[in-house]
From Swiss-Prot:
Its cofactor is a divalent metal cation. Keywords: Cytoplasm, Hydrolase, Metal-binding, Nucleotide-binding. It comes from Paracoccus denitrificans (strain Pd 1222). It is found in: Cytoplasm. The gene is surE. Binds 1 divalent metal cation per subunit. This is 5'-nucleotidase SurE. Belongs to the SurE nucleotidase family.
Length: 264
């Protein structure tokens, strides 16, 4: 098996090292793990692609590349250039330092990398490690992902469904709870949730030279979540697994609007 890995925290992020270990275990002795990851942190870029300027790419070692672009750029660089003659069988994006559940999905570069792979027709999984007070005291805050990740990926590969009921390929979003590996209670297949109390804030800053800047600050990640959602599962020490597709259509409203607005 040939696996491509990327992330949004950057080529030197500890979560990418965790993902390399996970991918190596899944690929097996005869497999290959290729890394094409951002040269610099790209958190919060979602599914952005850098088509307005070229992307500098550097080979750092055998099957290891850094691109000055987003996770989606990295996936495209791998498919169109680095791995053009031998495309990946699976794309893994992560392991993100922090959860990508709930509304975080919409901002996540980690999810964006997996989504781009799905749009390119490849099986893809995004992996994120929820962080909190219990992971902060661990020598390896990614240990839940490191221990449980290979098993979940194998289960999804065995399940083998990468198509949806529409024209889009599925990809999967996995979030590991904010606890040590031994405290994980199991896995819950859950929908994307919503935390009503989470809001971004903008803080102004005036530089000594008179220029005015704005810092975008994230809200609390512990606000009450939609019951039985991905966030809810994580807060109860379960791994959440959410099947997703690159389609934002609200099909319920689509059907209703057709009856109201369409003529002829």
């Amino acid at each position: 098996m040939r696996i491509l890995i990327t992330n949004d925290d950057g080529i030197n992020a500890p979560g990418l090292e965790t993902l390399e270990a996970i991918a190596t275990e899944v690929a097996g002795p005869a497999g290959e793990v290729w890394t094409v990851a951002p040269a610099f942190e790209q958190s919060g870029v979602a599914h952005c692609i850098s088509y307005v300027h070229p992307t500098l790419i550097a080979e750092l070692g055998p099957r290891r590349f850094a691109a000055e672009g987003t996770p989606a750029d990295c996936v495209l660089a791998a498919i169109a250039d680095v791995m053009r003659d031998n495309p990946p069988d699976l794309v893994l994006s992560g392991v993100n330092r922090g959860n990508n559940s709930g509304e975080n999905v919409m901002y996540s570069g980690t999810v964006g990398g997996a989504m781009e792979a799905a749009l390119q027709g490849l099986p893809a999984i995004a992996l994120s490690q929820y962080m909190g007070s219990r992971t902060a005291v661990l020598d390896d805050p990614f240990q839940a992902a490191r221990m449980h990740g290979p098993r979940l990926i194998r289960q999804l590969l065995d399940y083998g469904d990468w198509t949806s009921d529409e024209d889009f390929r599925l990809f999967y979003n996995i979030n590991f709870p904010p606890c040590d590996a031994g405290s994980v209670k199991g896995t819950r297949v859950a929908p994307q949730g919503r935390r009503q109390g989470v809001r971004f804030e903008v803080e102004p800053y005036h530089a000594p030279n008179g220029r005015r800047f704005l810092w975008v600050l994230g809200g609390s990640q512990t606000a009450e979540a939609t019951p039985e959602s991905d966030v809810d599962a994580n807060m109860r020490d379960y791994i959440s697994l959410t099947p997703m597709r690159p389609d934002l259509t609200c099909h319920k409203t689509l059907a209703e609007l057709r009856g109201v607005l369409e003529e002829g």
